[in-house]
């Protein structure tokens, strides 16, 4: 079976074709970073317009890359949410139109389920059950995963997502958009221990997160300590260490509470080297394993949507003619997949 995947939830246009026997046959990605850089963040209207321009050409490129014709496809998967409503509608409309024209089923995919399943595109595939840390610009979730569609949210951010906090703090430090990766690079030049940031919500029981206070703490530190190059690097180092420590502490709590020994990390922030290093060390101490996608599949992409769509297609989870998106969509409401 082959599935075309379409990802347009935010500021990346991702297209891929996944074959259940041969894996990823094609992968095309266009990033809108330059488009939004002058604004310091994603402008929804501009994002939607750019998806309109890029989606069909990227689909054509993916079909050529895979040597695939419409009759070779078994379904068309698209991100139906969560995300920016206009951007989601572009992908959903194109996917639904192609499905109708080619007489193929359309498969709506939850964006975070795509991220959650992305490590299954690698050679080392996690077995169920496991704990998943989904950490991106829009979400920070700790999820118990007993199977595809069998999700229990154990903890989530009560305010800013971790990736959002990275980007906002990077902006305070005068770094270009998107700031998360730039902040991590700057942190490499920082001096450990000069500044110590709090580890939010780790002084109480529970698995929820809060990162908005770290941005405020960073702003106050910049205001009081100045913004010379070394100070900025030291602040970046302290901020990143606080976020990574907080994520690791909550992961450890979730693993100990459930007794599970497998941890999956996914989403854009899962590409962070310090986070990967600390969670690898944690799982080594706990006698467990950690799994994550290759860096190109940490950020939004069509491959994860094609793969998740394949699982849903096999379970018969397709839609009719309606074009429906869900800008807000609780992961726990997804139907379980049984083959």
From Swiss-Prot:
Positions annotated to bind substrate: 134-138, 167, 180, 272
Catalytic activity line of the entry: L-threonylcarbamoyladenylate + adenosine(37) in tRNA = N(6)-L-threonylcarbamoyladenosine(37) in tRNA + AMP + H(+)
Coiled-coil parts of chain: none
EC number(s) recorded for this UniProt protein: 2.3.1.234
Subcellular location: Cytoplasm
InterPro entries attached to this UniProt entry: ATPase_NBD, Gcp-like_dom, KAE1/TsaD, Peptidase_M22_CS, TsaD
Listed GO CC annotations: cytoplasm
Assigned protein family: Belongs to the KAE1 / TsaD family.
Described purpose of this protein according to its UniProt entry: Required for the formation of a threonylcarbamoyl group on adenosine at position 37 (t(6)A37) in tRNAs that read codons beginning with adenine. Is involved in the transfer of the threonylcarbamoyl moiety of threonylcarbamoyl-AMP (TC-AMP) to the N6 group of A37, together with TsaE and TsaB. TsaD likely plays a direct catalytic role in this reaction.
Protein name: tRNA N6-adenosine threonylcarbamoyltransferase
Organism this protein belongs to: Tolumonas auensis (strain DSM 9187 / NBRC 110442 / TA 4)
């Amino acid at each position: 079976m082959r599935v075309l995947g379409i990802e347009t939830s935010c500021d990346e246009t991702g297209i891929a074709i996944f074959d259940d026997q041969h894996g990823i046959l094609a992968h095309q990605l266009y990033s809108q970073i330059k488009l939004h850089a002058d604004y310091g963040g994603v402008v929804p209207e501009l994002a939607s317009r750019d998806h309109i321009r890029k989606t069909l050409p990227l689909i054509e490129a993916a079909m050529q890359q895979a040597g695939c014709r419409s009759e070779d496809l078994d379904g068309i998967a698209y991100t139906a949410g969560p995300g920016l409503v206009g951007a989601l509608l572009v992908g959903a409309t194109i996917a639904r139109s192609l499905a109708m024209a080619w007489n193929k089923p359309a498969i709506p995919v939850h964006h975070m389920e795509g991220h959650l399943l992305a490590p299954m595109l690698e050679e080392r595939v996690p077995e169920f059950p496991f704990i998943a840390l989904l950490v991106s610009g829009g979400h920070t979730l700790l999820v118990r995963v007993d199977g595809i569609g069998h999700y229990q949210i154990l903890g989530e951010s009560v305010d800013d997502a971790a990736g959002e906090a990275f980007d906002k703090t990077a902006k305070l430090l005068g770094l270009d958009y998107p700031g998360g990766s730039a902040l991590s690079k700057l942190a490499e030049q920082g001096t450990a221990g000069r500044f110590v940031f709090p580890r939010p919500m780790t002084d109480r029981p529970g698995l929820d997160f809060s990162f908005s206070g770290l941005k405020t703490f960073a702003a106050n530190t910049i205001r009081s300590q100045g913004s010379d190059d070394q100070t900025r690097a030291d602040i970046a180092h302290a901020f990143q260490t606080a976020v990574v420590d907080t994520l690791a502490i909550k992961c450890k709590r979730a693993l100990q509470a459930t007794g599970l020994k497998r941890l999956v990390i996914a989403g854009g922030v899962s590409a962070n080297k310090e986070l990967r290093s600390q969670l690898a060390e944690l799982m080594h101490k706990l006698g467990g394993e950690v799994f994550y996608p290759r860096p190109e599949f940490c950020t939004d992409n069509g491959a994860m949507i094609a793969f998740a769509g394949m699982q849903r297609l096999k379970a018969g989870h397709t839609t009719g003619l309606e074009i429906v998106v869900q800008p807000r969509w609780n992961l726990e409401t997804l139907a379980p997949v049984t083959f």
